[in-house]
Amino acid sequence: MFLHGGWLHLIFNMWLLWIFGDNIEDRMGGVRFLAFYLFCGLIAGLTHLYANPLSTIPTIGASGGIAGIMGAYFFLFPYARIVIWVLFLPIFVEVPAIAFLGIWVIIQLYKVTTGMGTVSDGNDVAWFGHLGGFLAGMFLYRPFLLEDRARGGERYRF
């Protein structure tokens, strides 16, 4: 989860972590956030392994753990607006987080349902791992949340 396949792989993952990670870390605290990230990454890896049991190709990258962070963001901040970069253009646009995450999930689903998500077709992206991490983040974030924050004792009930 700490090794990447090149600079673009690293930059894209860190960009997504920068967009979604700070708010999730604020709700969890640093130690719980790290545990959550690692846990989602583990679930993502197991999902990829389940979908590609005969693969001998190692998986690298932070995508599964970051997908988990995105899954938690989907429920915790659905109406937030995020600023994203329009690829290959020096343009940044503000979009609803739920729209960005919805499109991201649709792309992942398209890849796995069309057979493009397996390593047997020469694909070097762990699409099943992305979905596994996202689903883990969506459904397993609650135990990692801090119950009480110093900001006025606000309680989080989701």
Regions found by a protein language model. Name each.
Residues M1-F158:
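A detector for small-residue-rich transmembrane helices and their helix-helix packing motifs
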